[in-house]
Amino acid sequence: MLPCFQLLRIGGGRGGDLYTFHPPAGAGCTYRLGHRADLCDVALRPQQEPGLISGIHAELHAEPRGDDWRVSLEDHSLQGTLVNNVRLPRGHRLELSDGDLLTFGPEGPPGTSPSEFYFMFQQVRVKPQDFAAITIPRSRGETRAGAGFRPMLPSQGAPQRPLSTLSPAPKATLILNSIGSLSKLRPQPLTFSPSWGGPRSLPVPAPPGEVGNAPSAPPPRNRRKSVHRVLAELDDDSQPSESPPPVLMEPRKKLRVDKAPLTPTGNRRGRPRKYPVSAPMAPPAVGGGEPCAAPCCCLPQEETVAWVQCDGCDVWFHVACVGCSIQAAREADFRCPGCRAGIQT
């Protein structure tokens, strides 16, 4: 690893954004910066105002200090050189620290554009074969064209690779590009559903266009509600609101429809709740229980058996045994034969 120092350019400009310097071992040296490429190691060619950069604008003096270098900046310009936004007196030499900001050219008034040449000073240790901009200083008085900022190859025996294979972009630029690529990452949305009764696997998020087409979960089934719907005609309160008003206003319509496998009990849903539960008034069982009160019960064998209660004695009869229909029992009062005989006498 070679102890080097760098000038990293900040802002606009074409190429030459990173300059890496490695002075010869064991001796100090001087690097010159300015717009005279034939006299300077680093050519500063302004694009906006050429007169703001002197031919030899400033010098970098490097002196060995242990395993590192002591670097100082000296101003030789008429327009000025700034270190951390403080103007350096002409001819004065100032030692630089890692991270200092160097500005070559005058500091513009507030509201104007800053200087084109704005650098950060860095002290680093690098491998020579990783940079094509490691240079040696130009000897004073040398005016050969193209002999300014040129690469220095590694020492004999050190691993090296051809300069043509090196990346043309500066290393600092590559690092900034890799950091900027973090903005391209797209976080995956965390989707979960509430757990009822145990853990569940997370559902796979569907594309936005398919969300509206996803089938909704079926509503939970209520077993008690289902049974009530099967025996909807057994309860006066279960009549729908669309039923005819006479049926809703009649308090003494006592009809029930039983299924053959079901056995009526004292708390049977079809029995009107306005009558007390007692043994004589309990509806007879279907299939094997107490028959209806008709003198000649025919014991209907249908799966669904309809019952009707007498409005006089509150006794239950099979609709088929008394010879009437459910519709007729709903529309008018039902009287059993015994009650009708009592009314006639």
UniProtKB/Swiss-Prot annotation:
Q: Where is the FHA domain?
A: 31-88
UniProt GO BP: regulation of gene expression
Q: Where is this region: Disordered?
A: 138-167, 190-277
Q: Where does Zn(2+) 1 bind?
A: 296, 298, 318, 321
* Residues annotated as binding Zn(2+) 2: 310, 313, 336, 339
Q: Does the keyword Zinc apply?
A: yes
In residue numbers, where are the PHD-type zinc fingers? 293-342
GO molecular-function terms, A-Z:
zinc ion binding
- Key words, A-Z: Metal-binding, Nucleus, Transcription, Transcription regulation, Zinc, Zinc-finger
Question: Where is this protein primarily located?
Answer: nucleus
InterPro entries hit by this protein = FHA_dom (IPR000253), SMAD_FHA_dom_sf (IPR008984), TCF19 (IPR042803), TCF19_PHD (IPR039095), Zinc_finger_PHD-type_CS (IPR019786), Znf_FYVE_PHD (IPR011011), Znf_PHD (IPR001965), Znf_PHD-finger (IPR019787)
Q: Which domain of life is it from?
A: Eukaryota
Q: Which one Pfam family would you cite for this protein?
A: FHA
What's in the GO CC field?
nucleus
Functional description taken from the UniProt entry = Potential transcription factor that may play a role in the regulation of genes involved in cell cycle G1/S transition. May bind to regulatory elements of genes, including the promoter of the transcription factor FOXO1.
- According to UniProt, the name of this protein is Transcription factor 19
